[in-house]
Amino acid sequence: MIKRVHLGQGKAEEILDLPNLIEIQLNSYEKFLQLERLKTNRPLLNEGLESVFRDVFPMKSSNGEVALEYEKYYIEYNSLSFTEKECKRKGQSYEAVLKIRLNLQFLTTGEIRQKDVYMGTIPLMTDRGTFIVNGAERVIVSQIHRSPGVVFYKEKDLYYARIIPYRGSWLEFEIDSKKDYLYVKIDRKKRILVTLFLRALGLNTRERIIETFYKIRKIEVNEDTKREITGQYLATNIIIKENMTYRAGDKITLQDIEDFLQNGVKEIDLIDFDGYDSVPGKHFISSDVILNCFEKEDAYFSLKDGFKELSRESVMLAVYSVLLPGEPISIDNAESDLRNVFFSEKRYDLGHVGRYKLSKKFGLDDLTTSVLTMTDIVNTISHLLRIYDGHDVLDDIDHLGNRRVRSVGELLTNIYKGAMSRVEKIAKDRMSNKEVFNLKPQELISVKPIVSAVKEFFATSQLSQFMDQVNPLAELTHKRRLNALGPGGLSRDRAGFEVRDVHYTHYGRMCPIETPEGPNIGLIVSLATYAKVNDYGFLETPYRKVVDGKVTDEIEYLSAIDEEKKCIAQANAAVNAEGNYIDDLISVRVSGDYTTMIPKNIDYMDVSPRQLISVSSALIPFLEHNDANRALMGSNMQRQAVPLLFPQPPIVGTGMERIVAKDSGVVVKAKRSGIVVLATSKKIVIRPEDAADDHDLDEYELAKYERTNQDTSFNHSVLVKEGQVVNKGEIIADGPATRYGEVALGNNLLVGFIPWNGFNYEDAILISERIIKEDLYTSIHIKEFSIEVRETKLGPEKVTADIPNVSGKILNKLDENGIVRIGTYVKPGDILIGKVTPKSEGDITPEFKLLTSIFGEKAKDVKNNSLKVPHGTEGTVIDVQRITKDDVSNLPPGVDEILKVYIAKKRKLKEGDKMAGRHGNKGVVAKILPVEDMPYLADGTPLDICLNPLGVPSRMNIGQLMESQLGLAGKYLGEYYDVPVFESATNECIQEKLKKAGFNETSKAVLYDGYTGEPFENEVMVGIIYMLKLHHLVDDKMHARSTGPYSLVSQQPLGGKAQFGGQRLGEMEVWALEAYGAAHTLQELLTVKSDDMSGRVKIYENIVKGIPTNVSGIPESFNVLMQELRGLGFDLSIYDDKGNQIPLTEKEEELINKT
């Protein structure tokens, strides 16, 4: 194990240990399946799968005679046919059978029939947080989406309030600030006046609406108050005589006051616009928008002056025609339909998150009601009008209080909810249709919708992804990813800049650095190191509590909503041993503002400087000295580093390397403390301290050269010896890209920042041959090739070494069964599996028929259908798998067996491979120079790698220089360093280490030219830099074509390596050749090498026969042009120099021949 020296400015030990880095996956799935609770007691009723079944059951028949009740569910572990490893090898899914116990109750007789009903299979999560589906490891990525609840926002001149439920219709209110009207939209349909909507929901008079939204004051009517009353609005109706009525919401004129005085009206109720804030707990408004809506109503329904209230019929007609246009209407039905849209639990569900958000927004205590209430609607309208008047502020849609995370468990719960609603429908139909008393519970439940929904989700959902398994970091990051795309999320094209941007609430929750470059930037992000997801799905981050200016060790997790307006100090603020701040003014954050405060006003303090970034970014030393764009590239490229044969841990690390290796799941950890009894390359056996008897041993199977999803090699190497004592949780075997229990993605190289003969121009890299000879960047890549042996109409296909028309030389790599031998080195075109397929009669030539009729020979009527090594692949066969129906019961229909061949290739670093450091400093290897030609130090040590110094200043990633300097000191002092992010070693500290190692404090040295032995004119900065080899290998990209497939439509060669295609010769390339006057080159490129069908056959014939040739026919594209011109009415024909017509098509040829 490596001893690391802590060189950070802070303390070596953290206040709070990092949580398990894949707990977002494990916890969410445990919440869904509740496996631990199933073993001991009842699962929680409102969580996961249990809640799905509780929502659907009990089911009752329409006549009320039969009820189907749910008791419990359980997982049949004995139904697991294969282990995780076997599932991968045999292409199966790692899943178990789900059963539920149902009671069918006959309410008339009291009889109960109980049965455990099969509910399909359910994929199980491995302890690494992944699923194995059809033999491949997959990850369900967490989705970040708009939280249910209410949001207030503004677009152009419109103010909006939107109530978003978890399930059900969206309700949207909008104020048009130009016209001062308030409208409602249901599910983004046509808009309705808000007063009409409120009347439809039960506030059926003007008086009731005014009473709900406005403060009312009483005032005496007399000569003194005349002036005050004029122009005010009535709050209640006044009826003096039949022809003298005044409506609530009408404006009072001087004439009206005269009428009041004449008719003895002593006191009236007015709307008090100024008293909107005077009643605690009431959200009154000061806006006349609702009164304007009354006027608009009058115009809409053509109500003349005089006392008229809208009838219930006309209101319902207006609202229902928008809700369900074109439907026949009955008033009672319309009213119940409208109420069902928002107030029925069957059709509307705010979810506990939506209810929490609504109650939090309006200061209510209710956390249980799952539907909307009239109070919610009134509060929403009031709040929107208060915002419009400037008494309240708008919401920020991108605030993390308005976005929440849906992880595996919740996504699966939703899938099961959808499937179970279909199951319920079918069951209810069966209850009413069948002879009820002969029924059994299992006959009512149709399991098809569930099976297909779960299968579809795991196989095809946008959030179920093929795991990125290039290296342990890629694996870990994939499980911690947050995706804003996917079903119910954003779409790439419609997502604007604001959604993608970094928001102040991301601090400690989402990483501001790690995100893809390209169209997904900002939509796919990573969880910050300490972040957790709370019960409501909101992201939380931990803080240390500060009481009266004193920092305590009490840790509190805060969501973005809880953190609002809190005053938070940075983790590196100076604190003495008692927990008091040393400085008088402390730098703090308050809701996105950065300021200074006295210690007494501080509420919380960060737990660690690395809490705001993700795991990938936390692996970059001296991150704070890099430009953010380069840090983004650095964190993304570490995930593409190929696992090497001999990796080294970085000399300059950040302290995260061990944690990442431990939580990624690629290393082997001891389950219990004990003594190692056996340690071989394939197996470790430990006798635990608390062993019950001699047979109680812990066995660990190690993986040897297994293929990952990305064709890299997964290999364990043992770290313990027999007789060694190990502790629980200790790493006993390294995995890919780990060394001594730490992540090791690359190697430490001696670097010089110096241009060398133009070979490192434009980020190219010059490297020493020593790297190749010592296999420092050699990696193993394993490819899988498979072939199916089918049952055809003409008989079964056969795997055999007896293949027609194949020479013995080709067959000598196969064994007697026609399968390639393990250990054989194969090249493109070699046969891996010999397979013959019966030929149909149509395939047989007349000569062959004659031979068979003479000799009666039927043995040769088969055709060669063998599996061959494709172009660009070579290597050693390391394994062959045969999967037959005896191994796996569910082979695809018509398939007798599947054979898989694994070919491993050792790839050394070569020109054209991409390399990168951890600071976004990437480049392509341009030349591999002999060691003796490399520039060397005064003591004769040659450099390993030369980087261009021009790659540093404009990119502003100074971190690579500081890493190189400290690495140099570490190399010569034999030390490994921890340099934590945001509290890195200072320049003084680095210089001190360099002096101690005997170097100049700038780490600049005189370099000598390997060619001449002369020193270079200026001193050169040298150091030790950590470089990675990326998964962009030249061998995978190099490609050449001689002859290959052509497109059916255009008859031109296909493009791309996968299709074995050619290089496109575009119009600019044609211009270049025209400019050179290269007529013959141009002619063959545009005809026989492209789409001249007859010409290319002829030229091939001539080449085979050895005849010098210059064939040119008519290219297919010319024929297309001809036909297009003919379509426009031109009659075109072509003649040679003798005046004979040249046929363009076969039809023309026939016509010419006839004439």
From Swiss-Prot:
One of its GO terms (biological process) is DNA-templated transcription. The keyword Transport does not apply. The keyword Transferase applies. SUPFAM superfamilies: beta and beta-prime subunits of DNA dependent RNA-polymerase (SSF64484). It holds the Pfam family RNA_pol_Rpb2_45. Gene3D superfamilies: 2.40.50.100, 2.40.50.150, 3.90.1100.10, DNA-directed RNA polymerase, beta subunit, external 1 domain, DNA-directed RNA polymerase, subunit 2, domain 6, RNA polymerase alpha subunit dimerisation domain, RNA polymerase Rpb2, domain 2. It catalyses: RNA(n) + a ribonucleoside 5'-triphosphate = RNA(n+1) + diphosphate. Keywords: DNA-directed RNA polymerase, Nucleotidyltransferase, Transcription, Transferase. It is an enzyme of class 2 (transferase). It comes from the Bacteria. GO terms for molecular function: DNA binding; DNA-directed RNA polymerase activity; ribonucleoside binding. One of its GO terms (cellular component) is DNA-directed RNA polymerase complex. Its EC number is 2.7.7.6. Belongs to the RNA polymerase beta chain family. DNA-dependent RNA polymerase catalyzes the transcription of DNA into RNA using the four ribonucleoside triphosphates as substrates. The RNAP catalytic core consists of 2 alpha, 1 beta, 1 beta' and 1 omega subunit. When a sigma factor is associated with the core the holoenzyme is formed, which can initiate transcription. HAMAP family: RNApol_bact_RpoB (MF_01321). This is DNA-directed RNA polymerase subunit beta. It comes from Borrelia hermsii (strain HS1 / DAH). The gene is rpoB.
